[in-house]
């Protein structure tokens, strides 16, 4: 019976340490990360700016900000996303706009 108690204790401690590690990593990650990409049509005429998510984020993403201040997470490899970025670069004469 002692090995079962020891196994339970080790499992409990391991689970608790993983939760602490996960929370700490989340704190150090940038202000905003995208967990999934928007799959609909990108309203190009309603976009005001764009930026790339932090390299520390689990997924590379381009974030578009609309005139209403809403953020749209997008796949940087998607041709519609590339088209929207080119549009904003021509409109604003530059690269990613800082938030």
UniProtKB/Swiss-Prot annotation:
Q: What Gene Ontology terms describe where this protein resides (cellular component)?
A: extracellular space
Q: Where in the cell is it found?
A: Secreted
* Tissue expression profile of the protein: Expressed in thymus, spleen, lymph node, lung and heart.
Signal sequence, start to end: 1-23
Q: Which Gene3D superfamilies match?
A: 2.40.50.40
Recorded source organism is Canis lupus familiaris
Query: What family classification does the UniProt entry report for this protein?
Result: Belongs to the intercrine beta (chemokine CC) family.
Q: What are the GO MF terms of this UniProt record?
A: chemokine activity
- Transmembrane region(s): none
Name of the protein: C-C motif chemokine 17
What the entry lists under Pfam families is as follows: IL8 (PF00048)
Q: What gene name is listed for this protein?
A: CCL17
